Amino acid sequence: MFIVDVIKKEDATGELKSLYKMIEHSLGFVPPHFELFASIDIEAMKEFAQYNFKMMSHAKIDKNLLPFLRLEIAKRECRSYCISFNTQMVTKLMDGEKLPSDASQKLLLEKVLKSLYETKTFTKDDLNSLEKSGISNRDFYDLLSYASNFMAKSKMIEVYLKKEA
């Protein structure tokens, strides 16, 4: 799958084994790209995992919105691995639903995507519409940061994927 050797969950020892257990406890499994990141830089992977756990328990952002956001970005950025992985996550976590039904969550997703892909047209009016729906500037910032981090990580995954000859 990757052009470098990774330490699989079943082969991990010590600190890495503990990290994998924490990830598995939270997600139910250890994604292959987490094994990739942890095999290269365990400290960075710990920070990445903690950040993801924090976002999954965000007070105002529905954790079920996250895989939809990642999938939409992966499609727009042509990230094959992330499209496949997040399609599976959406199917598993959401049981086939399109999006969380809360209107403020849909608006938040829309505005984060607009801020990333239509930056020149993103204005204070967009932030005001979020505020009117109960989403603070901090909540928007948190999801925008998450999305930006995902864009970087998805690119790193593509770099390390085995390419077909």
Predicted feature descriptions by range:
Residues 1-165:
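Hydrophobic alpha-helical segments
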